[in-house]
Design a protein with these regions (language model features):
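Cell wall/extracellular polymer interaction/catalysis modules
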Residues: 1-121, 126
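Short, basic, low-complexity termini and linkers enriched in Ser/Thr/Gly/Pro
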Residues: 126-141
Length: 141
């Protein structure tokens, strides 16, 4: 679920209604390449490897965009090019902390599902004003 702000987008990632982590993204700038978050919608996830980012997640079939990833970063304006980062805590608009830690936990959750040949669908939508979440404590081991 997303909340839109002038300097970034803050969100919450949940699985079957159970809070998993927060997310940060660039602000909405009409889906412009490398400077905007992506449109709300349903996106299938896939495993992807690159020498720079190592193993991460790819969002398939994003309208008018390519290589939209979920990977660790802590400041969308400085580090993102339209991708999504999981974070443990939101520290500002499009900013958070401990992204690498929570990203490893996210991969540990998603990768086994993908390796079984099952689909994982990410649904991106705007947070309603009455939305509430149950949050799991994410340990920093």
């Amino acid at each position: 679920m997303r909340e839109y702000f002038p300097n970034g987008v803050n969100g919450a990632l949940s699985v079957n209604g159970e809070g998993l982590c927060h997310t940060i993204e660039l602000p909405w700038r009409d889906n412009q390449h490398a400077i905007s978050c992506i449109p709300e919608g349903r996106y299938e996830l896939a495993k992807r490897f690159s020498p720079k980012l190592r193993w991460h997640l790819l969002l398939k079939a994003v309208p008018e965009r390519d290589l939209i990833l979920i990977h660790p970063y802590n400041d969308a304006e400085k580090e993102a090019q339209g991708c999504i980062a999981p974070v443990t805590t939101i520290t500002g608009e499009g900013k958070g902390d401990n992204s690498r830690i929570v990203f490893e936990k996210l991969k540990a959750f998603v990768y086994p599902v993908l390796e079984r040949g099952e689909k994982v669908i990410l649904v991106i939508s705007q947070k309603s004003k009455v939305e509430s979440h149950k949050w799991k404590k994410i340990s920093r081991e």
